[in-house]
Each structure stands twice: as structure tokens, then as C-alpha cells.
Amino acid sequence: MTQPIPIVGAGLGGLTLGRALLHRGIPSILFEKGTSNPRFNYAITLHSTAYQPLLKILDLDVNTLKSRVAVDTESGGTGSISQLTNLATHSGLYDTQSSFRANRAKLEQLLREGLDIRWKNTLKEIEKTSQGSKLRFQNSESCFGNLVVGADGVHSDVRKLLLPSIAPDILPYVAFNGKRRVAFKDFDKSYYPTMNGSNVVEMKRNDAFLSISVNGKKEEEVSISWIFSRPVRGHEDPLHRPNRSNEDANNIPEELFAEISAMGDLEAPFSKIFDTEKMRDDRILHWLMRTTSASLSELHDQLNKNKVCFIGDAVHAEPIVGGNGANAAIIDALTLADAIGKEESDGISSWYIDRHTAWSKGKEGSQRCIARIHEPPKSRVASL
């Protein structure tokens, strides 16, 4: 039997890779530091560039996929997005004509089916041996792999161990995300009529960007997320904390509420969501807009020396606002599985060359996009 490929990280990239390999009869084992509890209960935009090739390995049609993962499937919806919503194509990398809003937790649950996932495994060490790379985890578990895939996100332990000089860059933007639950009858009466049939709506107030998104609908309630973001203002901006710890993300400064109050009257549904008294009861997180990148020579070096390759945010993170990181990770996984399945001696090296070009294009596109998102409306003339 073929030795299973160890995949570190069971997020979208790792899970998609596992399913794509399974589709080809290639075994894998996913090691994830988190637990099996449902997580990431928020909405993402899926572009057809990513989900169309995913349908084949899942043996689903697009309508069935939407019925499984769309944010509003419980109420008969298909994750629709208004044409008024600007979707970033990143200079043609993504086809946005038939994009829809999916609940990430639902998508991950779907992708987990049939996979061998080892939960609560935090990577401790990677050692090169005659049998390949040996992975050691904090719980004393270990495994060997002739190829190891780092798919463990922007805070990648694999990257920290093998490429410690590469750290995420923090872009000069302030961003906060909040979650709220609204009674279904209230949402249907007071929110939905002003959202133009879309599961995500956006507005500008000078250089500030405001977004409201449906995460999921149930019979009794609707889960909603909001985003408030803007460029950093000077060196003493109280809302910009680029050096905060991960644990400090839920420490929300009072200045946020003061700034939102100062925006004045907003149109519905923004007036209901960005009500500072209601916001104080929301689960709010401070977001950092991160990017990562590695040179092609560094990646080839790790592939040749340690038989390790990277996908997704572990090696080319894009900012949450203006980025297409979820779609990029899915495409990484699908194309890497193709390269592995061909069993060519230079297959993964060639895959790196192809994808690195797309990663550079995506990073540049996401940075242009986040800049344009925060331009005052009168000066915003180019499309995202």
C-alpha cells in the first residue's frame, strides 16, 4: 500500500487536498492542532474557478453543493450575492459571475467525509531521515512521509520550523469583525427587505468600509457578521495594534465605538447593525490584515531537502478584506493533487512554478483591492 501523505492542517486547503487525493486512490493523514468541534461558522465567497473543479472530486452537481453549504440553504436559498456587491477578480484570476456565499463550517464538514483526521496534534519538530521527513507532535505521536504538505494557515508551524525568517506582513489597515444572532422574524421583517436579496451588503463612509454578511439561517434565528475597516490614521491610531498577541484579538478599545457613533446616521440595514449599544453585546474580534510570501527558490529548496511543500495561507496569505484566500487554497489543493497523481519526477517543482505566478498575482491583486475598497467614493474610479 502507498505510504499515506501527511498533511499538516485540516482547514480548507488541507481538507480539499485530502479529498482530491482520496478521489485518486492516494491515502493521506491530516494532522490538526484543533479539535473536531465545528469551527469557522462564518461566510466566505466561493468563485466558480474554485468550486467547479471541486464538484468532480465530491461527485456533486452545483445545486447539491449549494444545498449542502450555502449560508441560507435552510430557508431554501442558494447563497445569492447582489450584482451591486464588488467581487475581486484579481486581474482575471477568478470568475465571479456565478459566485455564492457558503458557510465555511458547512463546507469543511462536507470535505471531512471519508478522511483520516488526527485531531489535537500540534507539530513540534520536522526531522530529515533516510525514510523521508519525520514529523513529531507535542502529544508524542509521530509519522514519516516521502512528501509532507504544510497546509496549516497563516500561523503555520511547518513554515516556522523550516522557514523561520518568513513572517507575515501586517498591512496598514484597521479592521474589526463582529458576530450577532437575530431572531428570524426580526431579520425577515427589518433586515432582509433592505439587503436586495443578497447575503452580503456593503457601504462606504468616507474611507471607512462597512459590510454585513449572513453566516447561516435557522428556523429560529439568523447568524450575522459585520466588518468595519479603514486605513490606519497616523502613528498613534488607537485602533491599530499590529503587534498584539493572538489572545488579545478580543480586547476591543472604547475608541471603536466612539468612532462608529461619530459616523452619524446610516441607512438600513447598517443603522441596525452598527448601533453601538447593540455592538457591545456582539462577539467582536480585532483583525490584522496579513500577507505572507516565500521565494520560489526557498520553496524548491525545502522540497528538495525535506520533501515538504506548502499550500494556502501557510505560504501566500492574502488579507481577509480584499483577498481571495479561501478560493486560492482550494485551487492550490486541487492542482497539487493533480501534480502528485501524475507521479512525474518534477511534477511538484513544476506545480510550484505555475502556482507561484498565481500567488504573486493574487497578493498584488488583494493589496490593490483593499486599497481601492478604502478610497473615498469620489476617487474610486477603477473596478476591483
Give a label for each model feature.
Residues M1-G13:
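Beta1/beta-strand and adjacent pyrophosphate-binding region of the FAD-binding site
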Residues M1-Q3, H23, N63-R68, G77-A88, ...:
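C-terminal helical "tail/cap" subdomain of flavin- and related membrane-associated enzymes
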Residues T2-I5, L46-L162, D169-R181:
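Conserved N-terminal helical subregion
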Residues V8, F31, A151, I311-D313:
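Active-site flanking residues adjacent to catalytic metal/cofactor-binding acidic residues
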Residues G13, L17, S36, H155, ...:
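Conserved Rossmann-like nucleotide-cofactor binding loop
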Residues L87-D95, S99, R181-D282:
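Conserved FAD/dinucleotide-binding core of flavoprotein oxidoreductases
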Residues H286-P319:
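FAD-binding beta-loop-beta segment adjacent to the flavin cofactor pocket
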